[in-house]
Amino acid sequence: MQLADRIDFMELISVSGANPNGDPAKLGMPRTDSRGFGVISPVCIRRKLRDRLSEMGECILVSPSGSRGDVIARRASALAPGRDYTARACEKWYDVRAFGQVFAFPELHAPGVKGAVTIQQTYSVLPVKITEMKITRCIRNTDDRRGTQMGSINFVEHGLYVVKGSVNAYSAQKTGFSAEDAEKLRLALLRMFDNDSSAARPAGAMEVERLYWWRHSSMSGEYSPGRVFRTVEIKADCADPRCFDDYTITNSALPGLVPEIYGR
């Protein structure tokens, strides 16, 4: 079924003892802005959503098994070229019609796709404290016999992060992003950290606490996304919150626009 109305969403993510998104420019340390607030890039969020959607059976172009550019190029080029290439690409790959794609590959000349789903930069509610833990490597990969080598693990002690995004109904009509696709996106948001554990993100260290899902009654929406997001107010109950229960979260619904709330 065609998506006829705009959707806005906001997700609250708790982080405890994990690195939610490493910064390659800072040796993989958790991302922060100039004020010390934790940051998760939209690319990171989309990667996790792609992984969950792939597990749900959706066909994904930029998948983990083929994240190298040449592999993705071969996969994209396998679809027969033609004037309707972008339409067929949107029909085949969920992430193309959802997030868009630039087909900048050799021997493939096709217009780019503007996706229906946009996700903002994700920030923590308060500045985060990053802890560095020193570790040793006992297995040497050289002939150096001086003993063990030192390394480090960096993690956020605690942070509550806020993901904000929207589904543009006008773009959805162009890419074929349907109401059923939107429902799959909602489920993927709720399952974002399923099967996502690693040394940097131990199981249970990152959790989706709550999802606000606003369904407008028109393609343009009754209110701007910024005004919708401001209806959710988050305040810490103490100077040093350590868990989700240390926050008070209120929602002042706008007339004619009441969110669906998932989680606790």
Task: Give each language-model segment a name.
Residues 1-264:
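RNA-binding basic/glycine-rich loop and surface signature characteristic of RAMP-family CRISPR effectors
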